Amino acid sequence: MSSTGFTSPFGNANPFGSSGRSESGPMHRLVEEDENDTITSPTTPHFGVKNNAAPAFWNGFGGDAPSDMPVRRQPDDFPAHYNLGRRTSVSAESLKPVTDNSDNWSPPVHPKTAEQLERLKKAISGNFLFNHLEDDQSAQVLGALVEKPVPAKGIKVITQGDAGDYFYVVEKGRFEVYVNSTGALQPGPDGMGQKVGEIAEGGSFGELALMYNAPRAATVVSAEPQCTLWALDRVTFRRILMESTFSRRRMYESFLEEVPILKTLTPYERSKIADALESQKYPAGHEIILEGDPGHSFFLLEAGEAAAFKRGNDSPVKNYKKGDFFGELALLNDAPRAASVISQTEVKVARLGKNAFQRLLGPIESILRRTRYVEAEEVDPLQVS
């Protein structure tokens, strides 16, 4: 195999040792792998450079050799007829979210200098996958990521059709994305297929294969030398993000139960809203919505305090606390925002987009209208939207 391939930490040896017994752990592994397969570990210093002396059309990073390649025997390999005639099966890691302390799993931590940590924070700051994470979960992601220099142009980082093992964030450089209509990398100079895009600094790739247990959907190749990637392994990726999604949904369901306007909804309807909400934080003094702007979102105040202001009026016309909502009238009436809402303290809001608002809050539209008009009569003529 060319030196561009990933080096397995076990080489060609039986990863369970001479006894042939697997060690217990939080995940199950596929043991019927081809002995020729080599998979990259993000803990290796860097991606290798292609050895032109060996065929490389399927030998990208994370790539698998064809299943009909001859098998090189090693003294400590499995017996020659191991599993011959037996049905093989594939089992994946168990990633069921847990609510107790019986799960001893903890994410790996790879030490980083202050400079590396700062660069990494910048690299993932704009990535949508991490926007909803709590501070402690973001810290887990930062700790688990491993720096992966890519020294040369034309190095395959992931290969279409392969199993996905790592998720990557681009800190430096550019990467080209190719898709072959056959669904996998093919032999020959045009085997990667058609170029469909590029990924630049701050971008990411490889998440789909990890999220959905699907083969890689594209081949990603370095477009210039001296690139830098950060790699997150499959289990850590799924555990942190899936646990985050599960915890976030439970938190929102509990929160929505406390919102008076939503008490008439069924638990199922509230759960659908919980799935659609996006959490955002704002510092004190931030304009969450601006008077006169078109309305695109509905907001629930999770924490902190905010106030509504009309132009020409220095005093707030309405104050908001945890559990209050605003921004609904612009969506109900398809009208511009009637007031500005400004955070008075650091706040955390749950945002619901216009389409989701109209789809999910239809059952209480009349209540939303009635409640707001009652409040407008009792408090002020503001129709905050």
Curated annotation (Swiss-Prot):
Q: Map out region (Disordered) in residue numbers.
A: 1-51, 77-111
**Oligomer status and interactors:** Tetramer, composed of 2 regulatory (R) and 2 catalytic (C) subunits. In the presence of cAMP it dissociates into 2 active monomeric C subunits and an R dimer.
Q: Where is the composition biased (Polar residues)?
A: 1-22
Instruction: Output the superkingdom of the source species.
Output: Eukaryota
Name the keywords, alphabetized.
Answer: cAMP, cAMP-binding, Nucleotide-binding, Phosphoprotein, Repeat
- List, in alphabetical order, the GO biological process terms annotated in this UniProt record: adenylate cyclase-activating G protein-coupled receptor signaling pathway
Q: Which GO terms describe its cellular component?
A: cAMP-dependent protein kinase complex; cytosol; nucleus
**Residues modified to Phosphoserine:** 89
Query: What's this protein's name?
Result: cAMP-dependent protein kinase regulatory subunit
Q: Which organism is it from?
A: Neurospora crassa (strain ATCC 24698 / 74-OR23-1A / CBS 708.71 / DSM 1257 / FGSC 987)
Q: Which Pfam families match?
A: cNMP_binding
Q: Note down the stretches annotated as region Dimerization and phosphorylation.
A: 1-128
Query: What PROSITE patterns does the entry give?
Result: CNMP_BINDING_1, CNMP_BINDING_2, CNMP_BINDING_3
Q: What Gene Ontology terms describe what this protein does at the molecular function level?
A: cAMP binding; cAMP-dependent protein kinase inhibitor activity; protein kinase A catalytic subunit binding
Q: Which InterPro entries match?
A: cAMP-dep_PK_reg_su-like, cAMP_dep_PK_reg_su, cNMP-bd_CS, cNMP-bd_dom, cNMP-bd_dom_sf, RmlC-like_jellyroll
The reply to whether Transmembrane figures as a keyword in the UniProt entry is: no
Q: Could you tell me the gene encoding this protein?
A: mcb
Q: Record's CDD domains? A: CAP_ED
Tell me which residues bind 3',5'-cyclic AMP 1: 129-260
Q: Work out whether the entry's keyword set contains Nucleotide-binding.
A: yes
Q: To which protein family does this belong? A: Belongs to the cAMP-dependent kinase regulatory chain family.
Residues binding 3',5'-cyclic AMP 2 are: 261-378
